[in-house]
Each structure stands twice: as C-alpha cells, then as structure tokens.
Amino acid sequence: MVALLFAGAFSLAFTLFLTPLFIKLFHRLQWGQFIRDDGPQTHHTKRGTATMGGIVIILASVLGYFVGHLLTWDGIRFDPVTPSGLLVVFMMVGLGFVGFLDDYLKTRKQQSLGLGGWQKIAGQVVVATVFAVLAITLRDPVSGLTPASTAISLFRDLPLDFMALGAVIGTGLFIVWICLIVASASNGVNVADGLDGLAAGASIFSIGSYVIIGFWQFNQSCDSVSSYQNEYRCYEVASPLDLAIIAASIVGALIGFLWWNTSPAQIFMGDTGSLGLGGALAALAILSRTELLLVFIGGLFVIVAGSVVLQRIYFKLTHGKRIFLMSPLHHHFELKGWAEVTVVVRFWIIAGLLVAAGVGTFYLEWITQ
C-alpha cells in the first residue's frame, strides 16, 4: 500500500513540475505537431505545439514504479519488483518506442504520416509477441504463478483454455489473442488522442480502475489468509498488488501531464504516449485476468475506434457516402458545432460511466459467487 501511494505521488509530481522543462526542450528540438489541412479549422492554431509528451508520461510512470518500491525500504529490505509489474513496464516502453518512431518521422517530414499503417502494426505485433512469451514463461517468486494465463478471461479465467488444443497450436493461438488485444487497445487510445486532454483524461479512468481491481485481487488472493474461507471467490493472479502499483504510477503521471495537456494544450502526448498507454492498459487487463472486461473499462476507446471502422466500411459499401461528418467520432461532434472542451468533458463522462460499469460488474461477480 505504501509503495502504491509513493509511486502515484512521485509520478504526479514529476509530470506536474517537470513537463514545462520538456516543453522547452521539445521546442528546441523542433518536435512540433503537424496539423492536417483537411481537419477541423479550429485545430490549425495547434500547429507547432510540442509533441511526444508520451516520453514524459512513460519516464514518470517507470521512475514512479521503481521509486515506489525503493521507498518501502525499512532498513532490511524493500518490496521487490515482480515479473508482472515489469511486463507492464515492458509493454508501455515497447509500444511507446513504436509511437516515438512514428512521431519522430512526422516531425522530420512535417506530414501527418510517420510510420505506415502496416509498419506500426508490425511493431505492435513484435512487442506483443515477446510480451506473450514472457508472460507464460516467467513465474512469480512468491506464488509460483505465471503472470498470464492461456485461458480467455472476463472477471477471472474462463473454461476456455487455448492449451486444450495442444501445446503448439494453443501457444500460437494465445500469441494471436494477445496481439489482437494489444493492437486493439493501443490503436483505440491512439485514435482517441485527437482533442486536448481527451485521451489523457479517459486513460486516467481506465487505468485507474486497475488500481482498484489490483488492490481488490490482492486482498482476495488465493494466497492470503483471509481467502481460505472463500476459496471459490479468491483470485489466482500473480502479483496483483504490483499491478496496482504500476497502474497508480501511470495514473499519477497522467494527472500531472493533464495539467499541461488540457485545452489549450501546451504539449501533446503523441503516438509515443497513446500507443504506450494503450499497451499498458492491455497488459493490465491480460495480467489481471480481465481481458474481456476491457469492453467496458476501455469502452470509450472501443466506441471511438469503432466509429472509424464503421465509417470506412460504410464509405466503401456505399461508394462514397458517410455515416459521420468526420471520423473519429469526436471530430464529428466538432463539425456539428460543439466546442472542443464540451466534446472532451462529455466524452470523459462517458468514459467514467463505462469504467464504473466495468468495475461494478467485476465486484458484482464476486459477491454473487
């Protein structure tokens, strides 16, 4: 619990007080945002705003996680980091690097396209594949559990284990499943990062839910004394408290960053931030055994990304007609006349309600066992 509080407080202070220094540095490096001419006219004033703020978020989150553990030192030992926590860090940094390459190419070429679509997907697949292999190979030193399970999960593992099809086929399908989750979550956050503060605020709700879920799973762990009388309710999750610690560190970093990212934004997170955050969200869901619950917890990202898919399919089927004035969905409402801040706050409300529904059903499953 102490590590959780220290991690969140450190990362919040880091982004809140040091982001202005990074803004100056990024301007000096000429890392400014490129704005497309065919976007909403109100966005043209954003041209040149410092981007790649995801570097600040990721740096603060990682440092906060390790500092949180170091500050639990009692003169003899400190709470050790775990494979689960390190895997979340790996996913966030790995996808953040893919996003950084995309952002860097955009700023160098001064165009909206950095990496090609398939190049970006390839990077996500490589990171997700390494994550998947490590997640079923490493073992928690205390519980002996692997960080991830090869079963599909909702509130806990479902009786749908890929390994029932054999080790080779099962492992292959598990890797494909993980790649699908990672690509969906990271691209979902990436698509939502189109208005000042939208992705950062929504991510606070989504990733913040894993502080609650991780801490609850820790208290109801099958390894804890309190769960012996409720063995059918307990959770077989490796290092759930450490998942809560890294989630708290990310949330703290996002809150401090949002101070500078809210309208009018002085810095954007860029693909560095959005892909990294989406990767962290996917990793938290996979390692906490709540993969399918992402439909609620990442509900806003599902809606926004879904609007892009629907627009493209409808456009092709009708030979040029559109459902929305512009996709993603938040730009549709901008073109309808909504102020940017209005769209952002209302989308935050939707994100918060969907996260509440996700956490609520998670708890409801426990009390009805």
From Swiss-Prot:
GO MF term list: metal ion binding; phospho-N-acetylmuramoyl-pentapeptide-transferase activity; UDP-N-acetylmuramoyl-L-alanyl-D-glutamyl-meso-2,6-diaminopimelyl-D-alanyl-D-alanine:undecaprenyl-phosphate transferase activity
Query: Which CDD domains does the record match to this protein?
Result: GT_MraY (cd06852)
Q: Which UniProt keywords apply?
A: Cell cycle, Cell division, Cell membrane, Cell shape, Cell wall biogenesis/degradation, Magnesium, Membrane, Metal-binding, Peptidoglycan synthesis, Transferase, Transmembrane, Transmembrane helix
- Spell out the GO cellular component terms annotated for this protein, sorted alphabetically and separated by semicolons: plasma membrane
- Give any Pfam family that matches: Glycos_transf_4
Q: Which GO terms describe its biological process?
A: cell division; cell wall organization; peptidoglycan biosynthetic process; regulation of cell shape
Enzyme Commission identifier(s): 2.7.8.13
- Membrane disposition: Multi-pass membrane protein
Task: List the subcellular locations.
Answer: Cell membrane
The cofactors named for this UniProt entry are: Mg(2+)
Q: Which InterPro entries match?
A: Glycosyl_transferase_4, PNAcMuramoyl-5peptid_Trfase, PNAcMuramoyl-5peptid_Trfase_CS
Q: In which pathway does it act?
A: Cell wall biogenesis; peptidoglycan biosynthesis
- Membrane-spanning segments: 3-23, 53-73, 81-101, 118-138, 162-182, 198-218, 240-260, 267-287, 290-310, 347-367
Catalysed reactions, as listed in the record:
UDP-N-acetyl-alpha-D-muramoyl-L-alanyl-gamma-D-glutamyl-meso-2,6-diaminopimeloyl-D-alanyl-D-alanine + di-trans,octa-cis-undecaprenyl phosphate = di-trans,octa-cis-undecaprenyl diphospho-N-acetyl-alpha-D-muramoyl-L-alanyl-D-glutamyl-meso-2,6-diaminopimeloyl-D-alanyl-D-alanine + UMP
Which purpose does this protein serve, as stated in its record? Catalyzes the initial step of the lipid cycle reactions in the biosynthesis of the cell wall peptidoglycan: transfers peptidoglycan precursor phospho-MurNAc-pentapeptide from UDP-MurNAc-pentapeptide onto the lipid carrier undecaprenyl phosphate, yielding undecaprenyl-pyrophosphoryl-MurNAc-pentapeptide, known as lipid I.
* UniProt record similarity statement: Belongs to the glycosyltransferase 4 family. MraY subfamily.
Stated name of the protein: Phospho-N-acetylmuramoyl-pentapeptide-transferase
Gene of this entry: mraY
